[in-house]
From Swiss-Prot:
Family statement drawn from the similarity comment of this UniProt entry: Belongs to the IlvD/Edd family.
Note describing how the cofactor binds: Binds 1 [2Fe-2S] cluster per subunit. This cluster acts as a Lewis acid cofactor.
Cofactor(s) listed: [2Fe-2S] cluster; Mg(2+)
InterPro entries reported in the protein's UniProt record: DHAD_IlvD/Edd, Dihydro-acid_dehy_C, DihydroxyA_deHydtase, DiOHA_6PGluconate_deHydtase_CS, ILV_EDD_C, ILV_EDD_N, IlvD/EDD_N
Protein's GO biological process: isoleucine biosynthetic process; L-valine biosynthetic process
Keyword terms of this UniProt record: 2Fe-2S, Amino-acid biosynthesis, Branched-chain amino acid biosynthesis, Iron, Iron-sulfur, Lyase, Magnesium, Metal-binding
Reactions that this protein is recorded to catalyse: (2R)-2,3-dihydroxy-3-methylbutanoate = 3-methyl-2-oxobutanoate + H2O; (2R,3R)-2,3-dihydroxy-3-methylpentanoate = (S)-3-methyl-2-oxopentanoate + H2O
Organism: Acaryochloris marina (strain MBIC 11017)
Full protein name: Dihydroxy-acid dehydratase
Active site: S473
Keyword Magnesium: yes
Length: 561
């Protein structure tokens, strides 16, 4: 079968003369109508440093597609800057943008009968949004990560944007001056690229590399380095070859690929958001990952990378130390990676890793030796209990007190919580509850980076817990539990918590318990009234109506009919 199996419906035959006339206007010649048409989903934007360097990558990829014998069609998709919208009403649109990105790529590619797609993205939701579309469409596809930002520097220390969030808490607690806060602000983000630690963007790009949907080494390259542009060119050539061979996303996005991604995420200390996104992508690919799958792999995989937010280094340091392929090779050598999983290159994971060293170099300490890990088990734990009967997600490493029981401090929004922290109203041993921030309740499941960073900045990170039906930034660490399901807006137990109730977060036992009797909870539930929707028109209203529980990925196309 020809390589233009999809696009031939608009390029071939006498009846398609009008279609070809339109294509001639955008650069097609007589010899181009039999070539495969490749969509180039370009996430370029000057909204955020994460995406501001992407257009040059798209230009390099576009030229490479032509050289490889295909016809590129570049189109734009959106981005929301999590870092800029953080702590504001705008953050409600962040997770929504994942669906908009997915829908826009699917719409453009399917509407124009494209034969394959190369997507380039940078900020957090670009990655899962693109992969959702790829899994749904099941046409040959590859993802190109825009690249990570280089660290900022101040007084001999590496900085990331999270440094600025934490500095706000330090300033409010009187631990640094306004001048020191301003200095951090000015040095935290030195140029183009996604946030530098093993936060959500770098976590998801690493996951895609592990799954075989991006090229090896591509997820940790700096955005501004020439090797990133070369990688974009190589990715384009690989995609055109995949179109020839008809290697499809669902050939790659198998259960083995998802398990490989989870193993790598655990090994590098990745973001809690990966749980939400992989659940969603697996469903789009026809698989059915559950929260229990994450817990099973967590118990087997050690954290072997010393990366921010809870560690010392950033993604560019990981790249210099051997990148994701070295992490994968170590996992493969210890039976924790499926070597027979297929990649977009047509080779298996094991074949791709054949020449990669099995152990990290002794002259670096970003990647630890297998027998000296950061932590013996993974860091993303699934907690359950009467406060989260469907489950909740917590980072359980890098905390001094894995168990806390304390009085609930209840807040109906992120803003109210942050105000209390900055005003010094939160005390050691308190358990903060931020509710009505879930997928439906927010709507949009905002990330709580501002409150958690304020807690860290105030010196309370080891003594205060925080639970929420919202999410956390990949930059968050401490005794924090998110994705609590069922959420407050649908009557989950978190909606029934009252000020002063005793709550236990037990990371080791993976328990999240509200110390209130079943009878008392029943009586509270009978009195509970579901809040009216905050929005009755527009994208947030549509999202709140359609979105599912976070325990199944907060998708918008679950059980529609």
């Amino acid at each position: 079968m020809s390589d233009n199996r999809n696009s031939q419906v608009v390029t071939q035959g006498v009846q398609r003369a009008p279609n070809r006339a339109m294509l001639r206007a955008v650069g097609f010649g007589d010899d181009d109508f039999t070539k495969p048409i490749v969509g180039l989903a370009n996430g370029f934007s000057t909204i955020t440093p994460c995406n501001m360097g992407i257009d040059s990558l798209a230009t390099r990829a576009e030229a490479s597609i032509r050289t490889a014998g295909a016809m590129p069609q570049k189109f734009g998709t959106i981005t929301i800057s999590d870092g800029i919208s953080m702590g504001t009403e705008g953050m409600k649109y962040s997770l929504v943008s994942r669906e908009v990105i997915a829908d826009s790529i699917e719409t453009a590619c399917m509407g124009q009968s494209m034969d394959g797609v190369l997507a380039i993205g940078g900020c957090d939701k670009n990655m899962p949004g693109a992969m959702l579309a790829m899994a749904r469409m099941n046409i040959p596809a590859i993802f190109v990560y825009g690249g990570t930002i280089k660290p900022g520097h101040l007084n001999g220390e590496d900085l990331t944007v999270v440094s600025a969030f934490e500095a706000v808490g330090q300033h409010s607690a009187g631990r640094i001056s306004e001048a020191e806060l301003t200095a951090v602000e000015k040095h935290a983000c030195p140029g183009a690229g996604s946030c530098g630690g093993m936060y959500t963007a770098n976590t998801m790009s690493s996951a895609f590399e592990a799954m075989g949907m991006s090229l090896m080494y591509s997820s940790t390259m700096a955005a501004e380095d020439e090797e990133k542009a070369v990688s974009a060119e190589q990715s384009a050539a690989v995609l055109v070859e995949a179109i020839h061979k008809q290697i499809l996303p669902r050939d790659i996005l198998t259960r083995k690929a998802f398990e490989n991604a989870i193993a790598v995420i655990m090994a590098v200390g990745g973001s809690t958001n990966a749980v939400l996104h992989l659940l969603a992508i697996s469903r789009a690919a026809g698989d059915s990952l559950t929260l229990d799958d994450f817990e099973t792999i967590r118990a087997q995989v050690p954290v072997i990378c010393d990366l921010k937010p809870s560690g010392r280094y950033v993604a560019t340091d990981l790249h210099k130390a051997g990148g994701i392929p070295l992490v994968m090779k170590m996992l493969l050598e210890h039976g924790l990676l499926h070597g027979d999983a297929l990649t977009i290159t047509g080779k298996t994971i094991a074949e791709q890793l054949a020449d990669v060293p099995s152990e990290p170099s002794p002259d670096q300490d970003v990647i630890r030796p297998w027998d000296n890990p950061m932590y013996k088990q993974g860091h993303l734990a699934i907690l359950r209990g009467n406060l989260a009967t469907e489950g909740a997600v917590a980072k359980i490493t890098g905390i001094k007190n894995p168990q806390i029981t304390g009085p609930a401090r209840v807040f109906e929004s992120e803003e109210a919580c942050l105000e209390a922290i900055l005003a010094g109203k939160i005390q050691p041993n308190d358990v903060i509850v931020v509710r009505y921030e879930g997928p439906k309740g927010g709507p949009g499941m905002r990330e709580m980076l501002a409150p958690t960073s304020a807690i860290i900045g105030a010196g309370l990170g080891d003594s205060v817990g925080l639970i929420t039906d919202g999410r956390f930034s990949g930059g968050t660490y401490g005794m924090v539990v998110g994705h609590v399901a069922p959420e407050a807006a649908v009557g989950g137990t978190i909606a029934l918590v009252q000020e002063g109730d005793q709550i236990t977060i037990d990371a080791h036992a993976r328990k999240l318990e509200l110390h209130v009797s079943d009878q008392e909870l029943k009586e509270r539930k009978e009195k509970w009234e579901q809040p009216k929707p905050l929005y009755n028109k527009g994208v947030l209203a549509k999202y709140a109506k359609l979105v599912s529980s976070s325990s199944v990925g907060a998708v918008t196309d679950l059980d529609l009919f």
